[in-house]
Structures are given as structure tokens and as C-alpha cells.
A protein has these predicted regions:
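Conserved NAD+-utilizing ADP-ribose enzyme module
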Residues: 1-83, 89-169
Length: 169
């Protein structure tokens, strides 16, 4: 999956969009492929093994990979490396409906972008983040979300509260 960076949310500096920093944990949705009793990321087929006790899986990406292309009279930026998810459940569902034509079975999982993580907002209600915690199911999310120090909020609430403050602290 490649995220097309929405320049409505990001400034560009030195030919790269500037990542935002989560000021509060953000609730997002991760689409995973199911093969038997195992989970994988679509496209990259990275195995996702949930912790037996807490039902969580931690992603950590140390650096984003940004690609720049010029077409249609302007530059477009894509995030190739980063942890991809959706901030809108309906868009995640639309994506899984489309991807089900390619992959056998897909599930949508609750996930959290932890406070302090860097992230890019895409043009299709998608997000690429430097960190992501994916939960096996909604019950595991509800049981364990408190361990992240603050209450995760939906992106729409996050945007109302913080906008796109470009604060890297």
C-alpha cells in the first residue's frame, strides 16, 4: 500500500512533506489478510502475530520512505515505508471490499497510533505512521487501550482538537 500524502494537511520543506506528531493517541483501523489462523498485511504479506495475553501487535518504523512524482502539473508525494491504516472505518471497509477481490479473507482491526508518533495523512482517509498498535479484536482493544497513557480518540475529534499543528516535539 502506498499513501498519497494530502497536501491539505502537510507543508512541504526541502522537497518533502513534513510529518505530523500525534499529540494524543489516535484510534485508527488496520486491514489484515487472514490465512487460516494467521494474519498478514495485504501487499507486503508481513506476518502479524498477536500477543497471547493482551491480543496486541506492535509496529515500529524508524524512518519513512517518501517518493515524489510530477504529474498533472504538480508534485505528488507518496509514503512507501511506514505503517499504513485508515482513520475512517467506512473507508477501511471499502478498502477491504476491494481487496477481497485479490485476497481471500480480510478483517478490519482496531489500532492506535500512540501519542508522540509521527504520521502522514493521506488523500483517501488513510494514515502512515511511525508506530502502530493493532488489536486482535474490539474486546482486546477495550481491555488494553488504557495502557497507552491517554484515551485514544477518533481522528475527526483529534482534528477538531489539534488541527494540523506542525509541532515536532
Amino acid at each position: 500500500m502506498c499513501l498519497s500524502v494530502s497536501l491539505n494537511f502537510h507543508r512541504v520543506k526541502d522537497n518533502k512533506p513534513i510529518a505530523l506528531v500525534a499529540k494524543q493517541s489516535i484510534l485508527v483501523y488496520k486491514v489484515l489478510e487472514v490465512r487460516g489462523k494467521h494474519y498478514y498485511t495485504p501487499y507486503m504479506s508481513k506476518a502479524v502475530n498477536f500477543d497471547d495475553e493482551y491480543g496486541m501487535f506492535f509496529y515500529k518504523t524508524t524512518r519513512f520512505s517518501i517518493d515524489r512524482a510530477y504529474f498533472g502539473g504538480q508534485y505528488h508525494y507518496g509514503v512507501l515505508r511506514g505503517v499504513h491504516s485508515y482513520f475512517d472505518f467506512d473507508k477501511a471497509n471499502d478498502s477491504s471490499d476491494f481487496l477481497n477481490k485479490i485476497f481471500d479473507v480480510l478483517n478490519i482491526h482496531y489500532a492506535i497510533i500512540p501519542k508522540g508518533s509521527k504520521f502522514y495523512i493521506g488523500s483517501n482517509c488513510d494514515i502512515a505512521s511511525s508506530n502502530l498498535v493493532v488489536f486482535e479484536n474490539e474486546a482486546k482493544y477495550n481491555e488494553n487501550k488504557e495502557y497507552f497513557g491517554d484515551e485514544p480518540i477518533e481522528f475527526s475529534e483529534y482534528y477538531k482538537k489539534f488541527g494540523t499543528e506542525l509541532d515536532s516535539k
